[in-house]
């Protein structure tokens, strides 16, 4: 059993990945819905990733940070994320600065969260909203 605390971007991805690997997963979120900060990121437009190569992305971090991030970025890179969103009905586009956003439309950040919610449900993650964890 894997317990993920927090239903933000990192928590949703961690819960989905663990469930995809065959683990029973419960995700605890204090709010009444998942992805509260994702929904407001980028003014509601939701910068989901960067279009650069893994090498380019890692170059933006210190060597120690890069060593920490490298395995994760190679296991699930920006192209995989964009493909996952596309299959969920959210097309993305890279801007000149390399930032990747859902194609402009009202509620694009909420659409990104909806894709993750569907993935979590399909993977069998036990979602428990309104569950504050203390201690």
Q: What is the predicted function of each stretch?
A:
Residues 1-27:
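N-terminal Rossmann-like FAD-binding beta1-loop-alpha1 element of flavoenzymes
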Residues 45-96:
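Glycine-rich active-site loop/strand segments that organize a redox cofactor
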Residues 75-135:
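Feature captures the FAD/FMN-dependent oxidoreductase FAD-binding
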Residues 27, 39, 47-49, 126-128:
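Short, conserved beta-strand segments within well-ordered enzyme catalytic domains
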Residues 4, 70-71, 105-106:
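A generic secondary-structure micro-motif detector
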Residues 11-13, 34-37:
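Short N-terminal binding/cap micro-motifs at the start of the first secondary-structure element
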